[in-house]
UniProtKB/Swiss-Prot annotation:
NCBIfam families documented for this protein: NDH_I_N (TIGR01770), PRK02504.1 (NF002701)
Keyword Transport in annotation: yes
Source species: Populus trichocarpa
Role: NDH shuttles electrons from NAD(P)H:plastoquinone, via FMN and iron-sulfur (Fe-S) centers, to quinones in the photosynthetic chain and possibly in a chloroplast respiratory chain. The immediate electron acceptor for the enzyme in this species is believed to be plastoquinone. Couples the redox reaction to proton translocation, and thus conserves the redox energy in a proton gradient.
GO cellular component: chloroplast thylakoid membrane
Name listed for the protein in its UniProt record: NAD(P)H-quinone oxidoreductase subunit 2 A, chloroplastic
Membrane topology, from the record: Multi-pass membrane protein
Pfam families: Ndh2_N, Proton_antipo_M
Length: 510
């Protein structure tokens, strides 16, 4: 009898939960329409994979790319709509969140063509790879719009779990297994630290989980200047630091970059930073509004360490992917300047603009590395010597992307850094901007060293990899070159394009 009553109660509770979820999806589903498109694409991928043979594999790429493009289109149609909070306060829709979602979708759209030939040559499972990429994209999009602590914790876990699986996708490669093990262990530790910081924030605010309600709760409980908030700030900064990978939270980055498949590295190098930057901006700016001096100081220290450590160690690297790993550590130091400046002096607009350029510069560089790696089977920097004599197009494309990463005029990277540093200077961050300028000059040194090797490698310096270099006969090679061309063009856009981009970015301020 007792079991029968308990069973009825369980059925009633399950029915209520289902009806509430259906009600939320029915009335709030329009707010996550771009995300719903990706979910539909995921379901369609599974259906086609389970009912088709190997000959229908091009459809998987087509469906993945189409769902991403349709999500971008849905975002653009929703542009400039009034900010809305949906799903009982768990998700917020506004221009600021949507532009970060657009950047994530753009990264994923460009990364899929990069992966086509690599997957075919390495004979990796196609469906699972695309599923992980789309699911990670979905997690990043939900993180950008997350408005409460639970969603901010769950969404990056969705992204991170797929990232762990992608980094260890080549199971026969010992370096890939090592990379995913380190990534998983350190990612799990950082998630624990992050949720511990959330628990302090939750308790100090009187049990609130929504970001704005946390501020109101801290005011009501008079805990906004308490030691508990300082503890929460430290733990949350460490937890978010793993996602952004600034120094000293960068230890996992070089090993994961070197051991993971190159298209995966291209995907992780940009999407994780975009999603984490969006989340960090809102977390620091809203719940820690009363502790702005404290988190400004913490981020300044992280930015200085990142710019110095990343660019100094990058000089000594012999692997192209490890060099880009340390370069990305330095690049995130520049992005942090925009987070510190905030919206009062155009910091967020400059950060968004620079991240848009960084996506094109970084993905363009990785596209060149994917092509070279597939044709030669090496990642060593010295093996690039004399590439210009064999493939001028690839060598020039790589040179332009590296020069843009270094910030040489008149390339896009120069104007992105210039605007970012100018906003920091106007905000009074003189020491931070000075460090940024010095480390930018330092980064140009190791980029130019690679370019010199590409263009002027002597006969005795040319390794057998370049001497026997030949183009790939695979037709899918065109997709990699297409992504590379798009990224190279975007990396070389002159300063005339800056004004409309900055105006759009300034419209995203909450």
């Amino acid at each position: 009898m007792i079991w029968h009553v308990q069973n009825e109660n369980f059925i009633l509770d399950s029915t209520r939960i289902f009806m509430k979820a259906f009600h939320l999806l029915l009335f709030d589903g329009s707010f996550i329409f771009p995300e719903c498109i990706l979910i539909f694409g995921l379901i369609l991928l599974l259906m086609i994979d389970s009912t088709s043979d190997q000959k229908d594999m091009p459809w998987l790429y087509f469906i993945s790319s189409t769902s991403l493009v349709m999500s971008i289109t849905a975002l653009l149609f929703r542009w400039r709509e009034e900010p809305m909070i949906s799903f009982s306060g768990n998700f917020q829709t506004n221009n600021f969140n949507e532009i970060f979602q657009f950047l994530i979708l753009l990264c994923s759209t460009l990364c899929i063509p990069l992966s086509v030939e690599y997957i075919e040559c390495t004979e990796m499972a196609i469906t699972e790879f695309l599923l992980f990429v789309l699911t990670a994209t979905l997690g990043g999009m939900f993180l950008c719009g997350a408005n409460d602590l639970i969603t901010i914790f769950v969404a990056p876990e969705c992204f991170s779990l797929c990232s762990y699986l992608l980094s260890g996708y080549t199971k026969k490669d010992v370096r890939s297994n090592e990379a995913t093990t380190k990534y998983l262990l350190m990612g799990g530790a950082s998630s624990s630290i992050l949720v511990h910081g959330f628990s302090w924030l939750y308790g100090s605010s009187g049990g609130e989980i929504e970001l704005q309600e946390i501020v109101n709760g801290l005011i009501n409980t008079q805990m906004y200047n308490s030691p508990g908030i300082s503890i929460a700030l430290i733990f949350i900064t460490v937890g978010i630091g793993f996602k952004l990978s600034p120094a000293p939270s960068h230890q996992w980055t070089p090993d994961v970059y070197e051991g993971s498949p190159t298209p995966v590295v291209a995907f992780l190098s940009v999407t994780s930073k975009v999603a984490a930057s969006a989340s960090a901006t809102r977390i620091f700016d809203i719940p820690f509004y009363f502790s702005s001096n404290e988190w400004h100081l913490l981020l300044e220290i992280l930015a200085i360490l990142s710019m110095i450590v990343g660019n100094l160690i990058a000089i000594t690297q012999t692997s192209m992917k490890r060099m880009l790993a340390y370069s990305s550590i330095g690049q995130i130091g520049y992005v942090i300047i925009g987070i510190i400046v905030g919206d009062s002096n155009g910091g967020y607009a400059s950060m968004i603009t620079y991240m848009l350029f960084y996506i094109s510069m970084n993905l363009g560089t990785f596209a060149c590395i994917v092509l070279f790696g597939l044709r030669t089977g090496t990642d060593n920097i010295r093996d690039y010597a004399g590439l210009y004599t064999k493939d001028p197009f690839l060598a020039l494309s790589l040179a332009l992307c590296l020069l843009s990463l270094g910030g040489l005029p008149p390339l896009a990277g120069f104007f992105g850094k210039l605007h970012l540093f100018w906003c920091g200077w106007q905000a009074g961050l003189y020491f931070l901007v000075s460090i940024g300028l010095l480390t930018s000059v330092l980064s140009i040194y190791y980029y130019l060293k690679i370019i010199k090797l590409l263009m002027t490698g002597q006969n005795q310096e040319i390794t057998p990899h370049v001497r026997n270099y030949r183009g790939s006969p695979l037709r899918s090679n065109n997709s990699i070159e297409l992504s590379m061309i798009v990224c190279v063009i975007a990396s070389t856009i002159p300063g005339i394009s800056m004004s409309p981009i900055i105006e759009i970015a300034q419209d995203t301020l909450f």
